[in-house]
A protein has these predicted regions:
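C-terminal transmembrane-helix exit sites in multi-pass transporters
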Residues: 104-106, 123-145, 217, 264-283
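Hydrophobic transmembrane alpha-helices of multi-pass small-molecule transport proteins
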Residues: 142-158, 281-300
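Loop-to-transmembrane-helix transition segments
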Residues: 26-34, 73, 77-103, 167-175, ...
């Protein structure tokens, strides 16, 4: 199958920019799918950064995603990107996310995985707070409860014992705040532009911001590394499309708790790839994380029934 046929088939499965019967449920489904793919992407990156500089990984990943956008849209992509009303906020978002990634990877060098994971997952809480301030979303008790239950699940699963205030802790928290801010900006821009145009703008900025460092620290990948690099491009590209389109369909405060599901995927992939056997606290935390998602699903279903009555 030719690349353009594959992209057309995938895009046709997503009603990009068109109304759907149940947008919130559709947004939730896309968000969970997107975070699952990004967890797989992170696993591939973890294998790559042992030998390939992270700048090069981000640069090549963005090149692959941008190429996919060109194949899907064609030559008109340049004109649509230049005329897009969301160019400025997407540039700001790209800069915030790049700083967030640098902060996260820097913190991960000095903190245990459990510690950096727990700190980073403050992002859904920050995102929900920002959604009430910036987007004027009305956050229900059920949504706040879901965010709180999900974060408790993360803490129990990660078990960050003995965590103290330090520079790496600050970096991890900074990553969480910047990521949450980026997601709020994504919701704001998602209502005014198609997902693949936003993806193109975002990845053009990442190419420009990582290109110099990638060239200066370039390492020619082996065949195995090239396969992993292609994998990261595919996972990140489809994952971005799912998250961007999910944000078009549902409010930030609804989708925020589902970011925690990536931790469940992470534990599963950790077992399959590295043989990391989850402990009992991991299963308890996973149950709480899944419960947070169910709280949102059932509360939104009840809200729809009440509105229809």
């Amino acid at each position: 199958m030719r690349p353009e046929r594959f992209l057309d088939c995938f895009a046709s499965a997503l009603p990009l920019g068109t109304p759907v019967k149940n947008p919130i449920s559709y947004g939730i489904l896309l968000t969970v799918f997107g975070y699952m793919l990004f967890t797989a992407h992170d696993s591939a990156v973890k294998l790559l950064v042992v030998t390939i500089p992270v700048w090069q990984v981000l640069f090549l990943r963005s090149c692959a995603i941008l190429a996919g956008c060109f194949v899907y849209e064609g030559p008109s992509l340049v004109r649509k990107v230049a005329r897009s009303p969301v160019v400025k906020p997407m540039i700001i978002r790209s800069m915030l996310l790049l700083i967030a990634w640098i902060s996260y990877y820097s913190a991960a060098k000095y903190l245990q995985l459990a510690e950096v994971t727990t700190l980073y997952y403050a992002a859904p809480i920050v995102g929900t707070i920002l959604a009430t301030i910036v987007l004027r979303e009305k956050v229900t008790v059920a949504r706040w409860t879901a965010v709180g239950v999900g974060f408790c699940g993360v803490v129990i699963a990660s078990n960050p014992v003995g965590l103290s205030i330090s520079w790496p802790v600050y970096l991890a928290l900074q990553a969480a705040v910047l990521w949450a801010t980026g997601m709020v900006l994504l919701r704001k821009t998602a209502l005014h532009e198609k997902s693949h145009i936003q993806m193109a703008v975002s990845n053009i900025m990442l190419i420009l911001m990582t290109g110099t460092m990638a060239i200066l620290h370039w390492k020619t990948p082996t065949g195995y590394e090239l396969i992993l690099l292609c994998t990261t491009g595919i996972f990140a590209g489809i994952g971005q499309l799912a998250l961007f389109e999910g944000m078009r369909q549902a409010p930030v405060s609804v989708l925020a708790p589902f970011e925690y599901t990536s931790l469940v995927w992470a534990f599963g992939l950790g077992y399959l790839i590295w043989g990391d056997v989850p402990k009992i606290n991991t299963f308890i935390g996973a149950i709480l994380i899944l419960s947070a998602g169910l709280i949102i699903i059932f509360s939104e279903r009840r809200r729809r029934r009440t509105a229809a009555a």
